[in-house]
Amino acid sequence: MPPFAHRAGLVTEAERSQTRDALSEGGAFEARPWGGFRTLEEGSGYKVKRLVVEPGHRLSLQRHRFRAEHWVVIAGSPRVIVGGRARRLKPKATVTVPRGAWHRIENPGKVPVVIIEVQHGPYLGEDDIIRRQDDYGRTSERTERG
């Protein structure tokens, strides 16, 4: 597929499906309203995930008390917000999200965004999320461990 195809509206549903199929390797896929993720590996103090953000969707504006994250864009062109700074990224771009920083991943494009996320910290549970804003009604004053 030419690199401009998604911007020109030339991406077919079959091509989108092939992209999702190519990403289906690894552990169990955990669906979320925005797409979902697979945990690829985890150990003491770290976890590696493959995130897929579907076109037109975005994650919560959120932060974590116990972990920092490092993102590598694999596919798509996400808009990310970290610490109040928004920017558009391309494949191979990297982002560091410090512990406690408000952050979000958005997919304004026509193809799925794929990001490899490396989490590190003393606690990596899915309940270490404090949401400020969420498109899917999951906003809460305080959803955190401890």
What would you call each of these model-derived segments?
Residues 2-31, 104, 108-146:
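Double-stranded beta-helix
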Residues 65, 101-104:
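Short, charged beta-turn/beta-strand-edge "cap" motif at the junction between a beta-strand
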Residues 25-68:
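A short glycine-rich, His/Asp/Glu-containing loop-to-beta-strand
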Residues 84-102:
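Short acidic-glycine-tyrosine-enriched beta hairpin
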Residues 66-79, 83-84:
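Glycine- and acidic-residue-biased ligand/ion/polar-headgroup-sensing regions
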Residues 59, 85-87, 128:
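Short beta-strand segments
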